[in-house]
Amino acid sequence: MIATPAILFGIETEYGIARDGVEDLDVVAESIALVRSAMEPGVRMRWDYEAENPHHDDRGWDVPELRQDFDEANYFEQDTHRELTFAEIKSDLALGNGARFYNDHAHPEYCTPECSTLAELVAHDRAGERVVMACAQRLSQARGATVRLYKNNTDFRGHSYGCHENYLLPRALPWDRLTAGVQAFLVTRQIFACAGKFAIEAEDKFVSPHFQIAQRSDFFSELQSVDTMQKRPLINTRDEPHADPRQWRRFHVIIGDANLSPFATRLKVGTTALVLEAILRDPKRAFPQLADPLAALPADRKSTRLNS
């Protein structure tokens, strides 16, 4: 058994954004404007990126490049034509309630503070909804047209954006024991903790109009990887604990859907925390395994009878 305090957790939600009457919207500019509309007394535009290294892998090495580095280079090239500094483009805000609100590529992203109870987490997630909606209303007035936000995970054209969960775990827990214990759970969790959509998609394309119970599963093709934007993995290995790296790791879960229902959020995060606690209590325990976790994803997400 690995001694540990209660598991801390949090949620990062990227919102889809659109404006009525504008087909070819500059979503980056719109996202920047929306986030900056949250500027008011007590809100500061600052963030320390020094400890962030998206190339650092939980398995013990640094990858030379990410699959999304090409996209990042394109974003950087586009951003050089904006009359804004890097800090102004990111518009990283630390809110008074401990949340982080910023422009992540082409999406406004709201990150809850670290929470120790499900009630606290749900309250912060709902507070995030109110913050982004208040910003949308302000921006709509400024634009003279309705700015719409979508708490979902796809544009139905083969592009997905995330609702990520974070769980603070002791570094003493071996990575291979963590992944062996949680792998089958993350696949089967899709059955009861996702939001669903009426579409089947692939990278950069819409495939067919059929219902499935998960929004994100169409976009996962790897078992483990440090990437988050292309060839997404079932288990993300990015090692950015935002804490003392000698003691802690941040288990970054990227396969979940954004939930509107507080009950669904409780179920998603609560069951995950229980599984993680079970792993911490007995890391050597033999947890259930799937012969082919990636093959199981399309089976469970497209079942409407829960019998796959």
Residue ranges and their predicted role:
Residues P174-D176:
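A short alpha->loop->secondary-structure connector
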Residues C115-T117, T154-F156, A172, D218-F219, ...:
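Short, solvent-exposed loop/turn segments at secondary-structure junctions
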Residues D20, P170-A172:
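Short coil/turn motifs at secondary-structure junctions
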Residues M1-Y150, A180-A199, V207, S225-I235, ...:
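Terminal catalytic/cofactor-binding subdomain
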Residues H164, R171, F220-L223, H252-I254:
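The feature captures the catalytic groove of carbohydrate-active enzymes
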Residues F206-E222:
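Extended, Lys/Arg-enriched charged tracts that mediate electrostatic binding to polyanionic substrates
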Residues N153-P170:
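Histidine-centered divalent-metal-coordination microenvironment in nucleic-acid enzymes
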